[in-house]
Amino acid sequence: LGTVPTTIVPAVAGMASAQGDAELMESLSVVPAGMLVNAIFLSVWIFLPSRLEGLPLNRSLALTAMSALVVWAVVGTVAVLAIGSAQDGGASPESIAAAGIAMTGAFGLILGWSPGEAPSGSESVGASVLLARGGMAATAIGASVWVAGLGYPLVAGLASVFPAIFLTSMVALWVSQGPSVPRGAAAPMLLGGGSVGVYAIVAMTAIGDYGMAMGSVVAWAVAVVGWSLPSYAFLNWRSRAVGSND
């Protein structure tokens, strides 16, 4: 539930003020694919650390974080190019967004079906981490609005979902709790993050029908009820099922 749509709300409002309606639809169409890119980013935190166990923890953390960011940049670039090609071929923003949501959901269900060990942390998150998280999220929002104003709606859509909160969460959990906690948290975050894509596809219609403020509320409510809560129920069910078989 910690992955309900948050930073995407002001990002969409900012992008709407910086570009026209058609360009906003293009930006929103990238958001679900961007969350798939974020899911791949998080999967690096699941699979790579176990292959770096012979290294000191700080070096392992640095390599994991850098690798995840490189993967995000490469896959994000491929996604933007693919979406641009699909648009040139006549695909609608809505169909592109729906495809992104479907792929994110499938990826999340696969990794969530057999959840790994997710030990609870014993340390609270410090104020400096919260400040860093907020600062990076604000930077991502500002960057998306700026890029939208430059006339690059697809890049703006990807920038709006830069995994600032995911990155700071993974690093903070690793530093304070050890590598096993972020590994266990990544899969639930991966599936839950799909709610941002649902927000985007609903916002395509809701903002036009109800205006920015009420349309955002409608999109947020649909995303939480239609994605976040079912994802939470699914992950709880799989966790209990796997636990009962151990």
What does each model-found stretch correspond to?
Residues 2-5, 53-70, 95-101, 122-136, ...:
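Cytoplasmic-side transmembrane-helix entry/capping segments in multi-pass membrane proteins
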Residues 111-155:
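Selected transmembrane alpha-helices and immediately adjacent juxtamembrane segments
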Residues 40-56, 110-122, 170-181, 228-236:
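C-terminal ends of transmembrane helices
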